[in-house]
Every structure is written in C-alpha cells, then in structure tokens.
A protein has these predicted regions:
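Terminal low-complexity/disordered tails
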Residues: 1-7, 241-389
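Short, surface-exposed "cap/lid" segments of acyl-processing enzymes
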Residues: 2-65
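A Trp-anchored, charged/polar loop motif used as the substrate-binding/catalytic surface
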Residues: 3-13, 194-214
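Loop/turn elements at helix/coil->beta-strand transitions in domains of secreted/extracellular proteins
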Residues: 19-23, 58-64, 94-99, 125-131, ...
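Active-site-proximal beta-strand/loop segments in catalytic clefts of secreted hydrolases
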Residues: 27-30, 66-69, 104-105, 135-138, ...
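Catalytic nucleophile-loop/oxyanion-hole region of alpha/beta-hydrolase
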Residues: 68-83
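Serine-dependent carboxylesterase/thioesterase catalytic core
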Residues: 79-201, 205-207, 229-273
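Extended ligand-binding clefts on enzyme/binding-domain cores
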Residues: 114, 214-224, 229-233
C-alpha cells in the first residue's frame, strides 16, 4: 500500500505528510471476510483506468479509506464503525473544512445510514459533512439471480462436505445468506425451494432507514452508476439458457436468464435423483437490465454470475455448454441513482431523466460495465464534484 497511517481497519491517505485538513471518507462495500485495505487501495489507485486517490490529492483532499472486520455483517452494525470513523475524522482534522463521506456498493448504504443517524440522534456528534457520495450503490436493492442462488444452495446441500469444493460452496452459500446480502437483495431465497422475496432483515433495515428520514438531510447527495441512463440493457436475452452442464455429477442442469411472468428459471438434477425445478412469478426481466454487472473474482479471474455457476459445474466433473452467458445485471442503474423501483420492469428499461433521482446530482456510465469499476468517466466526475464543494 502507498504511504498512509492505519487506524484499525481504516487508513489515512493525506495529500501531504500531515494530518487531514479536508477529509474524504470512502467506505468499502460487501464481500466475504474483512476488508483488504491493500486490495481496495489498488482498485482505486492502480486499476489502469483512473488514479482516483491521486486525483483527490491533487484537488487538495485527504483520503480516509474505511474498512470493516466483517463485510457480511448487517449494514446497521457496520454503520457504527462508520460513525466512529466520521467522528474521529472531525475531531482530528486540522481546520474546520467540511467532510465528504460515502462509499462503494454497500459502503454507500452504510454511510448513508450512518450520516442520517448522526443527524437524528442527539447523543451523537455533528457529522460536519457537506457531501454524501455513492458509487454504484444499491439504493433500491441489488439483484442476485434466483437461479444462481438456488444452484448455489443446491450444490452446497449435495457437495458441501466435498474435501476440495466443499469449503468454497459453503462460503458462497453463506455469503448469499449473510445479514448484509439479505439486507441488499431485492429478492432472496435462503434455500433451494424457498419463495423469492424480500428477507425480513431487509424489511427491518428499510424500516430503520425510513425512521431516520431515508437520507441524510444536511448534505449534498451525489452518486454514480456503472450502468447507462439510456435504458439500453446488457444484451442478456430474457428466458434464454445462461449456462447448462451435464456429466459426472449433474444431469441436464441449467439456469435461465430471468424473464417476466411465471417462469421456470432453473433445472437442477444430480445423477440418479429427481430433477428440482426452480420457479419464479411476477419478477421483472432484470438480468438484462442496464446497470453495473455482477463480478466475481476467482482463481480463474472474474467469472461473472452465471460464469461462476459454469466454473462450479466444471469443477464438479461436468461438461458445460460453450455458449455461456457469463454475467448479468447486479445493481440496476435506477437503483444506483435512486430513480425508480427495480420491481417495475418498465422503470428498469426507461431512460433516466435528471429530475428522476433522489440524489442532487448523478452521473451514469457510457456503457454497462462491471460493478464498482473505477473509470476515468465516473472517477473524474466525482473528483470535480468534490473539488467544487
């Protein structure tokens, strides 16, 4: 990591070797385990597209990267860490410049909740923040394909004790059933035969957020989306088979791209067993919607959503059809800029107008790209907005 001063799971990246004068707090998001600060810094600064931290430094801002011991913990639990970080930044800064606070993916929800709570709770200090920012944050919910959730739980039930694949399967299933995933996902299933719906944990979180007014009120709210605002999707055709495997352990097992209406979205079958059919009803055709694309890092690289299923099928000894639709929408553009309900199929594909968003200003990518990918287009827009504050 570049020079910086660590504070627990945070690190200060000052513009000069001194205490922070104009702090910008950037929160990590959802993933397994604790924050890898070196990896997070690398993604922001050495991604090959845009040196976000260096550009903030050039604008005279001091960067504080905020991480968590458990990125699968509930949003409200990690918001306590964010509140502590904000309070400490206010206390330790030199001068009285207001802060900019926000985050990537779920990190934007954590800091949104933290700032709103600091405004509502008289027992907490003033956040002294002028700007809230989010980067492809699921303000209206995230999309984990129901077919992929079902396959993950199914494979874990069948091969969770496998000496090689078992740990990875249990980790993936646990990740989907973690408090954070349940709070983010607009549709969740905890097991293969469950009905897709909002988890109780999500409803509880949304209720708590509503009690705080939904948003911090005393800040300017900005955000960016890794999806387009034009309404043009990513090309994943609703109802088509995304991935199919057959062989040593699976028989004619396939996952489909989500379509509207009553659908069979997955057929799951192991050798010698009856097939398990996974159905949905009333869901939108969201896999192909404009938005930040599902990314999943593995030893094989970024597999994407259905590409991950293809990898698992192969590792389980099966032949996977070659025409895999590797990935799908993860954070719809209308969720990232808080401009519509992702349960509404018309809203998902409708062009986003300037006045549609709950944010004061937003910018959408010129193409549908990987979730939280740092690009010059989005990074430079954020830096300019922060510098102008």
């Amino acid at each position: 990591m570049a020079p910086g001063r660590r504070h627990g799971l945070g690190v200060l990246q000052p513009a000069e070797p001194r205490a922070a004068h104009r702090p910008v707090i950037l929160s990590d998001g959802f993933s397994g385990g604790s924050t890898n600060l070196d990896q997070l810094w690398h993604g922001l600064e050495e991604n090959g597209n845009f040196r976000f931290i260096s550009e903030l430094h050039a604008a005279g801002r001091d960067v504080i990267i905020l991480g968590y011991h458990d990125r699968t913990a509930s949003i409200t639990a990690n918001a306590e860490t964010a509140i502590e970080c904000i309070s400490r930044a206010v206390h330790e800064r030199v001068g009285d410049a207001k802060l900019a606070v926000g985050g990537f993916s779920m990190g934007g929800l954590i800091t949104r909740y933290a700032l709103a709570r600091m405004e509502s709770d008289p027992g907490l200090p003033d956040h002294e923040t002028a700007m809230y920012l989010s980067y492809d944050t699921p303000h209206q919910g995230a999309w984990f394909p129901v077919s992929l959730q079902a396959f993950t739980h199914y494979a874990t039930d069948k091969w969770g004790d496998h000496p090689t694949l078992g740990p990875a399967l249990r980790q993936l299933s646990g990740l989907l059933n973690s408090p954070a995933a349940k709070e983010m996902a607009r549709w969740h299933i905890g097991k293969v035969d469950a009905e897709p719906e909002q988890a109780p944990e999500r409803l509880t979180f949304l209720g708590k957020l509503d009690e705080l007014g939904g948003w911090p009120r005393n800040v300017r709210k900005i955000g960016v989306a890794n999806g387009v605002k034009t309404g043009v999707g990513n090309g994943a055709e609703a109802g088509s088979i995304a991935v199919r495997g057959d062989g040593e352990t699976l028989q004619d097992t396939w996952l489909k791209i989500q379509a509207q209406g009553d659908q069979i979205v997955a057929r799951l079958q192991t050798a010698g067993d009856e097939a398990t059919m996974v159905s949905t009803s009333g869901l939108p055709d969201i896999d192909g919607a404009p938005g930040g694309l599902f990314t999943m890092q593995s030893p094989a690289g970024d597999t994407g959503s259905f590409g991950l299923a293809a990898l698992l099928m192969s590792l389980l000894g099966n032949v996977v059809d070659p025409d895999v639709i590797a990935t799908s929408c993860f954070i719809p553009a209308i969720s990232a800029v808080a401009s519509g309900d992702i349960n509404d199929p018309k809203a998902l594909y409708r062009p986003i107008a300037a006045g549609d968003s709950a944010l004061d200003a937003f910018h959408c990518a010129g193409r549908n790209e990987g979730h939280t990918t740092m690009t010059e287009e989005l990074g430079a827009w954020l830096v300019n907005e922060i510098a102008a504050e």
